[in-house]
Amino acid sequence: RGLPSTWREDICARGMQGKYADALLISALTGARPSELATGIDVWVEFDELLRKNILCLHVIGVKVKASQGQPNRFVAYAEDDDHPLVAALVKRLSTEPGKKLRVQIAKAGNFSTEIQRLARSLWRNHDHAITATCFRHQWSADVKSSADGDAASRGLGHRSAKTRGH
């Protein structure tokens, strides 16, 4: 609420030189929980024979997984030539890595969340609400819901059932 439509891009740009630059991009593009970033997220580009194009792939290992809840593994994919600025930024980042592969892992989930709040405050000092890692997650879900069905968003967030869809 009350943020520009580019708020994720703005936060990622502000944090681009910091130690969480990669994690910010991953959080914005997957809706991953900070604890999932602490586990580590694999990112790579591969050629998809069916689509006949390069695909940016992100593999998230779920953390809220039990026998009857959660997705143990999630894959999020974007076309490498997607013109979304966050996809383009991650593709550019991968271009400097051998084999266009990268493992993004943070040391502490709490520190990452604190850094997002710090970056947001530096951009929007007078904003009424705290901007947290959960905001990235909710925005990712809203984006998926606007272009697909709600069940796809629930699965992408790691929920096993649409019943656990809260946003």
Question: Which functions belong to the PLM regions below?
Answer:
Residues 39, 139-143, 155:
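DNA-binding alpha-helical recognition surfaces that contact promoter or target DNA
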Residues 39-86:
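Conserved tyrosine-mediated DNA breakage-rejoining catalytic core shared by Y-recombinases
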Residues 130, 147-167:
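Short, polar N-cap/turn motifs at the start of nucleic acid-interacting alpha helices
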Residues 23, 117-120, 150:
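Generic structural marker for isolated residues within well-ordered, non-membrane alpha-helices
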Residues 19, 32-34, 73-76, 90, ...:
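Short, cationic motifs built from Arg/Lys/His that form the positively charged side of catalytic pockets
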Residues 78-129, 134-135, 140, 145:
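Active-site/catalytic core of tyrosine-dependent DNA strand-transfer enzymes
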Residues 2-34:
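Basic, Lys/Arg- and aromatic-enriched nucleic-acid-binding interface segment
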Residues 20, 26-40, 146-149, 159:
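A short, glycine-centered helix-capping/turn motif at helix boundaries
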